Amino acid sequence: MFKRDWHNATVESYFITDDRTGPHFISPNDESAKEVIETASVVIIESYLPDDVRPNGKVIQLWHGTPIKRLFLDSKEPHQNLNIYNYRARKYNKWVHQDYLVVDSTEVVKYFESAFPSHKLDILPIGYPRVNYLLNKSQDLTLRKRIIKGLQLDTSKPVLLYAPTWKSNTSEEDILPLSDKLLNKY
C-alpha cells in the first residue's frame, strides 16, 4: 500500500518514525510531527498518541498482537493505575477518538469490545499485514530457505518460537525457563 501511495500524486503520505529517514519520514521529536498528525485526513497508528496530540481526521489503530492476556478495562494494571496520573481516563479518552481498530481475527473481536468499549469504534477483523504475508507465503519454499539462511537455523532440528507478550511489570517468574535439554532439541 505504501509503495503505491508514494507514487500516487493524489495521496500525500508521511511516516512518523525514528526508524527511517527520507522525504516522507518525520521524527516524533520533530516540531512538525504534531501538526502533520493533527491536520491529516487519515492517521494510522500502532500504539498510543501522546496526550497533547489530537488528530482531526479518521484514526485507524493497527493493534499489534493477539490478546492472550486481559486488556485495558478488563485488566487490573495495578502498576499503571498506581503510578501513572489518571492512567485509565487518559488512555480511554484516546480510544474514544479512534474510528477503526484492525485486529487479527473474528475470534478476538469480543475481547476488544469488552476491553475498549466505544459506540464509535468499528472493529475490523482483517488480520495483520506482516502475519498475513507469512501465512500466505507458508508454502513458498524460496522464502522459507531465505529465512532459514538469514536466521542461520539448524535444518536438522525443528524450530521453536518463544515470543512472550509485553507486560509492564515483567518479573523473572513470568519468563518460561529454557533448559539446556530443550535448547538442544530445537
Locations of regions flagged by a protein language model:
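Conserved catalytic-core segment of nucleotide-activated headgroup transferases in glycan assembly
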Residues: M1, D5, A115, P125-Y186
